[in-house]
UniProtKB/Swiss-Prot annotation:
Family: Belongs to the scoloptoxin-15 family.
Entry protein name: U-scoloptoxin(15)-Sm3a
Gene Ontology terms, MF aspect: toxin activity
Subcellular location: Secreted
Range of residues in the leader sequence: 1-23
Amino acid sequence: MERKVFLLLFVIVLLTLPGFMSAAKKEIPYKRQKFPKKSQCIEACANALTNGDKSKITDVKSRFYKCICYYNP
């Protein structure tokens, strides 16, 4: 039973790994707010990196006066 669980976890990790590896990471300054909301970061990242295409943004993280963007180029 343990082997099946480990095998299943290993397969899941292998299937999700390419999605994380292909995403590019970039920091975007956000001067309007100390800790911007996620929706504000998504919009700022989309405008700065993908010409407004929000579907290419995979994840964002809010930091002190900046947004960390993960996107598919």
